[in-house]
């Protein structure tokens, strides 16, 4: 389920390499989440291709080498033998290059490092937007600056921006462990007491190994991982080489995404408590978007964080969070856990929209059909497009009760409207393609 988006005011962040308009902490989080999704898409698109090309090249070289050897052994013509020898030497050089190449590993390392480069940018954007939204925070910057340098600035605003950029760069030079501790002290809040904190720090330390040591385990890596309580399946030794692999890579993407959401939201709520409704709306949309992408574990992790928050803006929003959490749990086969989440709240006095959600998730499809008819064409939250689009109805859309209820409410079959929507979207795509071609 989702709610209407808030429309925050604009502010300018200029501490990164390029100036860019960022409306709120929500925009900062969204920008980072899209970068992580970009990295994941690159991994899915190019790593398999690199592995396939590597193996195909190996097969080609083996075949060429075999042909050259046959020519040398069997050909009586001296010119042909000489040609075979030259070709074999060329092939041997290609084989040597092939055997010393590692395109898959190179791509994995590059994309993994890119994750944390984006996180560095996220930290800068986050601090910048918070300071620019709440100007009193500038008073906490205690850096000294010579008068001669002060006089080079044309305005107080320019000076403040310079000081903020210096503060952000100083923070970025620290390890992530020290960055989080700095932010805890700066804003008087706990930021490291969450389940994936040790895993996040291990990932960040592994990034350092790939950046500086080609993945070779160092004493510092082991010391810091043990300091935060990271549980190794089998603790490596100094000098061992750490691999990445698909499972670890995508788990790192999951962890860093969730950490960014939690960090951004926690500071947003602490520093700008009056914006809690805006923060909740953003969180609801993030979870809703991950549900649409069928990123169930990401939805679950963020939902756990949300329902552990000390305050949620409205009862309606809290119920939306419960419903979306249950949707994700049900999608991974944890139907009983999903109902347990819903049963934390009393739904008897709620709107029909929420009663429909409960019935659907509890697979009470006859009851759900009846509630659909009570809601009619437009509910408090549910509209016609919701039946086509919302993850809540993902399984219900295959049930006869859904088809009957939909036709009863709207006067035409679900598949007729679905075909109409498909044609509209097709026309939109074609229109966009035509505009791009002009």
Identify the residue ranges that each predicted region occupies.
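Charge-enriched, short contiguous segments at helix-coil
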Residues: 185-257, 266-269
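Charged alpha-helical initiation segments
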Residues: 1-117, 121, 273-277
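Generic helix N-cap/helix-start motif at coil->alpha-helix transitions
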Residues: 275-285, 313-323, 345-354, 382-386
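Residue-level signature for tetratricopeptide repeat
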Residues: 289, 328, 358-361, 395
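Helix-loop junctions and short alpha-helical segments
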Residues: 70-201, 206, 219, 223-224, ...
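Alpha-helical segment of the N-proximal tetratricopeptide repeat
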Residues: 275-308
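Alpha-helical repeat scaffolds
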Residues: 297-306, 334-346, 366-377, 400-410
């Amino acid at each position: 389920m989702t709610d209407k988006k808030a429309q925050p005011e604009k502010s300018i962040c200029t501490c990164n390499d390029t100036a860019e308009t960022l409306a709120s902490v929500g925009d900062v989080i969204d920008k980072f989440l899209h970068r992580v999704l970009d990295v994941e898409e690159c991994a899915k698109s190019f790593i398999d291709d690199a592995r396939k090309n590597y193996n195909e090249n190996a097969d080609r070289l083996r075949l060429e080498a075999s042909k050259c050897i046959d020519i040398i052994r069997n050909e009586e013509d001296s010119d042909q033998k000489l040609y075979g020898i030259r070709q074999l030497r060329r092939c041997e050089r290609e084989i040597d290059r092939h055997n010393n190449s590692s395109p898959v590993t190179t791509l994995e390392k590059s994309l993994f490092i890119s994750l944390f480069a984006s996180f560095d940018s996220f930290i800068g954007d986050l601090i910048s937007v918070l300071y620019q939204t709440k100007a009193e925070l500038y008073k906490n910057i205690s850096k000294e600056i010579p008068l001669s340098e002060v006089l080079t600035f044309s305005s107080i605003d320019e000076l403040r921006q310079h000081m903020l950029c210096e503060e952000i760069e100083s923070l970025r030079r620290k390890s992530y462990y020290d960055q989080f501790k700095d932010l805890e002290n700066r804003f008087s809040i706990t930021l490291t007491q969450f389940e994936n904190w040790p895993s996040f720090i291990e990932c960040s330390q592994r990034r350092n190994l790939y950046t500086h040591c080609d993945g070779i385990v160092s004493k510092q890596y082991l010391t810091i991982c043990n300091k935060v309580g990271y549980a190794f399946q089998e603790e490596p030794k100094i000098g061992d080489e750490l691999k990445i692999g698909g499972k670890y890579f995508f788990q790192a993407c999951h962890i860093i995404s969730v950490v960014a959401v939690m960090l951004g939201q926690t500071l947003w709520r602490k520093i700008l408590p009056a914006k809690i409704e805006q923060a909740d709306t953003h969180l609801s949309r993030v979870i809703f978007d991950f549900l649409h992408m069928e990123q169930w574990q990401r939805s679950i992790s963020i939902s756990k964080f949300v329902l552990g928050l000390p305050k949620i803006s409205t009862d309606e929003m809290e119920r939306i969070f419960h419903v979306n959490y249950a949707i994700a749990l049900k999608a991974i086969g944890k139907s009983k856990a999903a109902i347990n989440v819903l049963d934390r709240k009393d739904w008897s006095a709620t709107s029909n929209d929420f009663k429909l959600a409960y019935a659907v998730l509890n697979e009470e499809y006859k009851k759900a059909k009846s509630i659909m008819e009570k809601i009619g064409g437009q509910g408090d939250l549910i509209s016609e497009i919701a039946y086509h689009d919302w993850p809540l109805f993902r399984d219900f859309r295959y049930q006869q009760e859904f088809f009957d209820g939909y036709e009863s409410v709207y006067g035409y079959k679900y598949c007729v409207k679905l075909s109409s929507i498909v044609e509209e979207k097709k026309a939109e795509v074609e229109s966009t393609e035509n505009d791009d071609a002009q």
